[in-house]
C-alpha cells in the first residue's frame, strides 16, 4: 500500500490549514488535511503518493490515545482501550492504516498534559527518533523535514500497544 519513495509524516498538536497549505506548495511535499469531511482515505493517498514527503494530520492512533487517557481517568474502561488497540492493529494488518515514519508534535508547549504524555511520553519511549517536537510554523516544520533524524524504526506495534495499560501518565517514557 505505501509508496516506498515517500516518507510519511503525521503532524499533531496545533496543526493549522495554513501550515499544511504552505507545505503543500513545496515541490517535494504532498501535504493534506485528512481529518476533514470528504477527505480521501489514507489508503488512497498512500497509493498515489509521488513526492518524497507525505505530510498529513490523520493520527492512526488517535482513538487508542483517547482510550488510554480515558482508562487512567476511569479504570473500568479498560475494555474500550482493548477494543481500540485491537481495532488499530487490525487496520494496520489490513493495510487500511499505517504508523507514520515520523510524528511532528507542533507547539509542544501548547498541547495539553495528556497529549504531551501520549506523544512525548508513550510514543517517544517506543521510538525516540520518530516523535519530534517542533514549533508550529511552516518554516520550522520545513527545517525539520530537511533534517529528520535516522534511527530505529517503530517496533512491531502488537507488543507495545497491547501493553498500554501498563504505561502510567506522568511516568510514560521514564526509565
Positions of PLM-derived features:
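NTP-dependent small-molecule kinase module
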Residues: 2, 8, 15-16, 109-175
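Hydrophobic beta-strand segments of well-ordered beta-sheets in folded domains
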Residues: 4-9, 28-31, 53-54, 100-105, ...
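Conserved substrate/cofactor phosphate-moiety recognition/catalytic segment
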Residues: 5, 13-53, 62
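Short, flexible coil/linker elements and helix-boundary hinge sites characteristic
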Residues: 24-28, 95, 173
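Generic secondary-structure transition motif, activating predominantly at the C-termini of alpha-helices
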Residues: 27, 46-50, 69, 108, ...
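ATP-dependent NMP and nucleoside kinases share a basic, alpha-helical "lid"
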Residues: 44-47, 56-126
Amino acid at each position: 500500500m505505501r509508496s516506498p519513495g515517500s516518507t510519511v509524516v503525521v503532524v499533531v498538536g496545533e496543526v493549522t490549514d495554513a501550515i499544511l497549505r504552505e507545505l503543500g506548495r513545496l515541490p517535494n511535499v504532498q501535504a493534506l488535511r485528512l481529518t476533514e469531511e470528504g477527505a480521501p482515505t489514507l489508503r488512497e493517498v498512500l497509493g498515489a503518493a509521488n513526492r518524497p514527503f507525505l505530510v498529513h494530520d490523520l493520527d492512526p492512533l488517535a482513538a487508542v490515545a483517547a482510550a488510554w487517557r480515558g482508562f487512567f481517568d476511569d479504570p473500568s474502561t479498560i475494555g474500550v482501550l482493548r477494543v481500540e488497540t485491537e481495532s488499530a492493529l487490525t487496520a494496520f494488518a489490513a493495510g487500511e492504516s499505517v504508523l507514520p515514519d515520523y510524528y511532528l508534535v507542533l507547539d509542544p508547549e501548547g498541547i495539553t498534559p495528556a497529549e504531551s504524555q501520549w506523544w512525548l511520553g508513550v510514543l517517544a519511549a517506543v521510538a525516540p527518533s520518530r516523535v519530534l517536537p517542533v514549533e508550529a510554523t511552516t518554516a520550522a516544520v520545513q527545517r525539520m523535514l530537511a533534517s529528520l533524524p535516522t534511527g530505529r524504526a517503530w517496533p512491531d506495534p502488537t507488543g507495545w500497544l497491547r501493553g498500554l495499560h501498563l504505561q502510567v501518565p506522568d511516568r510514560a517514557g521514564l526509565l
